[in-house]
Structures are given as C-alpha cells and as structure tokens.
Amino acid sequence: MNKTTLHDQWVVKAPVNDVFEIMTDFEKFPKNFPKVAESIRVNRRVGNYVEMEATVRSFGKRFQVKMNYQILPGKGFISDNDSYQFGTSGHEEMKLCQHPKGTLIDYTYQVTIHNKWLGIIAVPLLRWYSMKYWEKAVIDQLKKILEK
C-alpha cells in the first residue's frame, strides 16, 4: 500500500456560514461542482453523520465512491471514503475558519492506494495534480457562487 497526504489552503471572500452551507449540501454537489461530482445518493443521515454513494470524476474517469461524513456544524466536515472501483481509500478533512478576507478553507486528504503497481505511478501524479484540480473544479467554482 502506498499512502500520501494532500493539503492546501484557500481564502474565499464570503462568511464561514455561507461556505459551510454550500460545502455540506451534498445533494447539490453535482449541480454546484459538476467537474467532480456526477451524482450523489444519500443512503442514511443521522444527526451530523451522513452515509452516501457518489459517482465522481477524476483523472478523466468516472468511478464510484462510498463516503461516510461527520459534519462539524459551522466548521466543516471529516469523511472516510472508499473507492473500491479505483482501488483507493481516504480520510478527508475540510475545516473552515474566519479570515480577515472571508473564510479560510483548510483541506487535507490522506489517500491510500491499495494496488502496489498503481501506487508507484499514482502517488507522484496525485501529489502534483490533485490539489490543482480540486482548486479549479471546487474552490474556483465556490468562489463564483459566493463572490458575485
């Protein structure tokens, strides 16, 4: 198994609660962030815990992901994800806090690649490409929605 941690931070010129509302409205992800989410089905919601399945896009492919989210009210979320089809699993954290210019998004994704040979190729590619793609597909889109 190969593991890598991806991390970045961005500032969005909007209040924390506005960012939180969009980033935890999972059912609207396909509409708000079509470059990464094709479809999402919430299977179970109990309090701040959400179990869902999604068809996501990455590296020019579509694949299924099972996600278990813990919503941190007003602060972001923590998620454990399993992409059995792509051969990866991950632990994702998105934390929000006030910033003089709006909201600071602190995003970390710890990825485990279960296929040894895929890991040799994928780890360098993930480190180089993933956060740039996430910024373009999610953060830039979030800014378009909120910074009108």
Identify the residue ranges that each predicted region occupies.
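Hydrophobic ligand-binding cavity/cleft-lining segments
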Residues: 1-47
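A generic structural signal for ordered secondary structure
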Residues: 6, 50, 70, 137-139, ...
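Residues that form or flank phosphate/diphosphate-binding pockets in enzymes
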Residues: 14, 87-90, 116
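Hydrophobic pocket/interface hotspot
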Residues: 19-23, 29, 52, 69, ...
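Generic recognition of short, well-ordered alpha-helical segments
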Residues: 24, 64, 91, 120-121
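Hydrophobic-ligand binding "helix-grip"
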Residues: 45, 57-106, 110
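A conserved amphipathic terminal alpha-helix motif
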Residues: 111-148
